[in-house]
């Protein structure tokens, strides 16, 4: 049996370092959450003694914030798909002039710093509130609109990339055999673009769930998303219960990715996203 070449060894070493770089921060967070030191002096890894007491001391506010973030992210992903799919169809199939301009316009929110977006929506909601008496800041609707603004371009981008490779003769063949436009869309177009929809929805969910800058401007005490709650916990009274809370989210996120892989396959999601 021939020994592996230096190139093969170097490849495995490089891949190993890449995995270590990605997994080490999560391993430190999860491992430190089990440290049982009586006097907390900082992040301890590896833990000196094992305990689960910090999981029992996770503040109830973290679970409330987690529920808010999950509900918000799911609704944002759904709304981004409802807005993004028609927009992508209009850009690719429409006969309007200046398609490249509209595509660049739809992608603009991805290029704007999130802090600028948060400030802009805060000022917009205050101005609209002064005019109408309805203030959307520190409300679910306001936070939803802010996240929808930055999440929808991901759905547009992934669906556009699929539509640009779509063979329109399939639709023409279906319509030539008597299928209506709606039936053609439901049976031919929609199943074909679903990998792009899945990719965009996943990106939209992650953008909303992990956002801090926009939520910092659009939340208030008692109405805080999970990342902001973690941020405040680390800033004011950092202790291992914060690490325990973050560890639960890490574990559940990995389980969710496994479910996505089982249901639709991450390969289709990644390929659709990379083709933008």
Where are these regions (language model features)?
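Membrane-interfacial helix termini and adjacent extracytoplasmic/periplasmic loops
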Residues: 42-47, 52, 98, 115-149, ...
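Transmembrane-helix boundary motif in ABC transporter permease subunits
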Residues: 1-7, 74-106, 119, 123-127, ...
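A structural signal for multi-pass alpha-helical bundles of membrane permease subunits
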Residues: 25-38, 65, 118-132, 202-208, ...
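N-terminal, non-cleaved signal-anchor transmembrane helix
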Residues: 1-67, 71, 75, 259-276
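Loop-to-helix entry region at the N-terminal start of transmembrane alpha-helices
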Residues: 64-71, 126-155, 195-196, 201, ...
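C-terminal transmembrane helix and the adjacent membrane-cytosol boundary/short C-terminal tail
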Residues: 2-13, 35, 160-175, 181-190, ...
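Transmembrane alpha-helices
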Residues: 13-26, 108, 118, 149, ...
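Interhelical loop and adjacent transmembrane-helix boundary motif
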Residues: 2-8, 37-41, 51-61, 209-259, ...
């Amino acid at each position: 049996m021939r020994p592996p070449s230096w190139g093969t060894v170097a490849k495995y070493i490089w891949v190993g370092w890449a995995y270590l770089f990605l997994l080490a921060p999560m391993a430190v967070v999860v491992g430190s959450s089990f440290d049982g030191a009586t006097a907390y002096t900082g992040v301890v890894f590896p833990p000196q003694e094992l305990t689960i007491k910090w999981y029992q001391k996770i503040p109830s506010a973290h679970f409330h914030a987690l529920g808010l973030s999950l509900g918000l992210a799911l609704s944002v992903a759904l709304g981004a798909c409802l807005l993004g799919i028609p927009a992508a169809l209009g850009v690719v199939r429409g006969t309007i002039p200046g398609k490249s301009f509209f595509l660049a316009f739809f992608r603009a929110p991805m290029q704007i710093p999130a802090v600028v977006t948060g400030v802009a929506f805060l000022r917009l909601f205050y101005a609209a509130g002064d005019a109408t008496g309805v203030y959307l800041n520190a409300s679910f609707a306001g936070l939803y609109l802010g996240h929808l603004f930055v999440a929808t371009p991901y759905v547009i981008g992934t669906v556009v990339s699929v539509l640009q490779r779509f063979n329109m003769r399939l639709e023409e063949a279906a319509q030539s055999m008597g299928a209506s436009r709606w039936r053609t869309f439901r049976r031919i177009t929609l199943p074909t673009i679903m990998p792009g929809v899945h990719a965009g929805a996943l990106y939209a969910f992650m953008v909303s769930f992990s956002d801090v800058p926009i939520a910092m401007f659009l939340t208030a005490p008692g109405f805080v998303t999970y990342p902001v709650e973690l941020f405040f916990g680390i800033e004011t009274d950092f202790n291992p219960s914060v690490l325990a809370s973050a560890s639960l989210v890490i574990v559940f996120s990995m389980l969710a990715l496994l479910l996505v892989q089982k249901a639709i396959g991450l390969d289709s999601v990644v390929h659709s996203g990379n083709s933008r």
